[in-house]
Amino acid sequence: MKPLILKLSVLFMLGISSSMSSATENGADSYALGAEGMMAGALPPPGIYLLTYYQNYHAGRFDNGPPNFHLDVNALIPRLVWMTEKNYLGGQLGFYAIQPMVDLRLSAAGMSDHNSALGDLMLGSMLGWHQGNHHWIGAVETVLATGKYDTPTATQPVVANIGKNYNTIRPILAYSYAPPNGIDISTKLSYSFNDENDDTHYTSGDYFAGDYSIGYKLTDKFKVAVEGYVFKQVKSDELHGEDIKMRGQVLAVGPAVQYQDKNWSIEAKYLTETQVENRPEGHTGLLKFIWAF
């Protein structure tokens, strides 16, 4: 069977799932593409912080995927961060937990499904370093298969699954350069290792993903930026141990603005996807709100 036909067959046998963004198995993954932007590499002082993300994602086509494809995702993602006073290897220690809440509408090839549920729980630990205008973060994130997941059936082959039904380990590096002249150059890079979906015997291939931001501070409180994300699958998916030799990729870019006050900030962006291969293609709007307790 040719790779494209095999991939399409797998999509209809297993159902198509998604949460915040999409990649790998059935065009879906747990990485929040585009969520981070300005000062992504700078951790705050010790304390407790609430970060709340809202994302609307719409895709009207699936490259090398099923016909008549439409995907609409609305996600509210609270992230609780605890920065401790402890230091290891010269870096400040912190922890975080993320629990997505997702509403997903999906249609493909004349079939449709809708789901609203909790997504997969994410837990992470991190170290942050600061040296003059340079800021770094090193982190390890675990994505647990806790979200709602329904195994597709012959009568319901297209399923709007919120959870992925597999676990992920994700090392992360982030960096920001913020000199006094107002420039803000930031990036967050990650690599994801996925285990097998026990219900489908499908293993999503390893992939590289990253957010980027090139911004400028217009005033003490207001910044503008060009932001986006990249995704590149570097290992093929597997079904029952056999490679499916199609790998996803995407590049997204768009404008962003940020307003920051004493103990809170809000960032908004609109990103359009291009250079898409073997995955949904669309656009996304994101809001990120940070509150320091």
Q: What is the meaning of each model-derived region?
A:
Residues 50-56, 95-101, 138-144, 187-191, ...:
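Transmembrane beta-barrel strands of outer-membrane/channel proteins
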Residues 27, 34, 55-57, 201-293:
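Outer membrane beta-barrel transmembrane domains
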Residues 24-26, 39-47, 84-94, 108, ...:
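Short loop/turn motifs that connect adjacent beta-strands in outer-membrane beta-barrel proteins
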Residues 1-31:
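Cleavable N-terminal export/targeting peptides
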Residues 40, 52, 78-82, 123-129, ...:
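Residues on the lipid-exposed face of transmembrane beta-strands in outer-membrane beta-barrel proteins
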Residues 101-197, 202-203, 260:
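Outer-membrane pore/translocation modules
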Residues 22-82:
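N-terminal, post-signal peptide beta-strand-biased segments of exported outer-membrane/organellar beta-barrel
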